[in-house]
Structures are given as structure tokens and as C-alpha cells.
A protein has these predicted regions:
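Short polybasic amphipathic segments
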Residues: 232-234
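N-terminal beta-loop-helix "entrance" segment that forms/cooperates
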Residues: 3-20, 109-113
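Compositionally biased, intrinsically disordered low-complexity segments
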Residues: 31, 172, 223-225
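Beta-strand->loop->alpha-helix junctions that form or flank phosphate-binding loops
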Residues: 2-4, 20-23, 58-65, 102-106, ...
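Phosphate-binding loop of NTP-binding sites
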Residues: 13-14, 27-29, 38-200
């Protein structure tokens, strides 16, 4: 259910999913697992009814983790750019002959949706740091676009914000790989930390734009990068 009509609700209806506008305890089936986002408060009548009945209630990140269980899970995180990066990666994998499952926080034009159930064993998802819920994931690969201080109303300081990304790196499955942008100081520091922990780490940057915190050149150097606001090439 949602508070008001939207194109997303129309898309769900077209997919055969029953949706409700407005929140009401009567909307909750007695045998349902209830999935909530961080924005849903305990006072929400549907959540309150599920709690009263003793039904299973899980966060949407936990539901996503269950959906990705047993798959090669690629989680894309960062204060900025994670939606674009996860969408671009998803389309690149499709063009390469993979058929990944996808969960992105915006509509991908080629799909007409931000979600897609593929036939392959790769799952690409945008990982949200704003509420710390990305700590519910156990990715095979983590991509961090940047760790620029954000959501300080929750975290309180740059140090605390960077620490949650350190914790995120700790969620990597054994033998997993961390990919970090070497141009951003926060992600560069994260890469250096990960290497001290013996984690397979790959950094990338445009030629000559590496952060001093990287301590050297990036592993992958991007040359002749161009963008027109709609497409990019290098």
C-alpha cells in the first residue's frame, strides 16, 4: 500500500499485484509476511496490526537479501551515484549476455522499471547507506562510488558516516571483492583500510585525478572520459 496514486502503483497493477491507496489494518492478510521501509512508522495501522497479530515483519533490505540469497550479489553503494552506477552496470551485463536480476531506486528506461527478475545467477542492487540497512547484505562484490559525508542528521559526524562503510565492507562474503572510486577521499581511505584486512580491492580513477588518500595510482585508469549529460564514454 501507499499513501497516494503514482505511476509505480500502475506498474504494479499491470504486473498483477494487488495494491491499495491509503493505509488500513484491513489491507493486511493474516498469513502475510509484512515488508516495511524505514519510512514506515510503528504507528502505521497496517504495521501495528501485523505486530498485534504476531506476524513476521521484515525490513525491505532483509527482503532483498532473501531474494539475492544463493546468487552472485553485487551491491552498489555511495553517497552519490549509486542509482546511475547500478543501472549502468545492469545494462552492461545484459549487453554482455548475462540476464541479471535488478533492484535499483529509479526507473531504468530500457526496462521501464527499477526492478527485474532475470534468469541468470547475478543480482545487481542499489545499497542504501542512509539508514544503515545495507548492513543486512552479504555481497560477492561491493562497489563504492564515494563516501562524501551525508545523512549527518542520522550519523552525526563524518567519522561516523565513514565507519558505517567500514562496517559495510565487513559484510562482504569470504573471498569477495571491493571496488572503490580512487578520486574520492572517503572511498580511497576505505580501499586502503580494506587492503589492510586482506580484502581483494580494486580502485578506479580518471588519469591524474586520484585522491592523495589513495596513496598512489588507481588500479584502473580511465582515459578520455566524455559525457553529454545523457551518455558517457571512455
Amino acid at each position: 500500500s501507499d499513501q497516494k496514486e503514482s505511476p509505480i502503483l500502475d506498474h504494479l497493477r499491470d504486473a498483477g499485484i494487488e495494491v491499495f491507496v491509503g493505509h488500513d489494518a484491513a489491507h493486511v492478510p493474516a498469513d502475510a509476511v509484512v515488508v516495511v521501509s524505514t519510512a514506515v512508522r510503528e504507528s502505521n495501522p497496517e504495521l501495528a496490526e501485523a505486530r498485534r497479530r504476531g506476524q513476521s515483519v521484515i525490513h525491505r533490505s532483509q527482503a532483498l537479501a532473501l531474494a539475492a540469497s544463493g546468487m552472485r550479489f553485487v551491491a552498489v553503494a555511495g553517497a552519490h551515484g549509486k542509482t546511475t552506477t547500478s543501472a549502468m552496470l545492469s545494462m552492461a551485463l545484459r549487453d554482455a549476455g548475462e540476464d541479471p536480476s535488478i533492484a535499483v531506486g529509479a526507473v531504468i528506461p530500457q526496462l521501464g522499471s527499477g526492478a527485474y527478475l532475470g534468469s541468470g545467477d547475478v543480482f545487481v542492487a542499489e545499497a542504501d547507506e542512509s539508514d544503515g540497512s545495507f548492513l543486512n547484505y552479504t555481497p560477492w562484490i561491493e562497489i563504492v562510488t564515494n563516501v562524501e559525508p551525508d545523512h549527518l542528521d542520522r550519523y552525526g559526524s563524518r567519522e561516523a558516516f565513514e565507519q558505517v562503510f567500514v562496517d559495510f565492507v565487513g559484510c562482504l562474503r569470504q573471498g569477495g571483492t571491493l571496488v572503490c572510486c580512487g578520486e574520492d577521499g572517503g572511498s580511497a581511505r576505505l580501499a586502503r583500510y580494506a587492503r589492510t584486512q586482506g580484502i581483494d580491492t580494486v580502485t578506479y580513477a580518471r588519469a591524474g585525478h586520484e585522491s592523495a588518500d589513495l596513496g598512489g595510482s588507481a588500479d584502473v585508469i580511465i582515459e578520455e572520459a566524455h559525457t553529454d549529460g545523457h551518455t558517457a564514454s571512455a
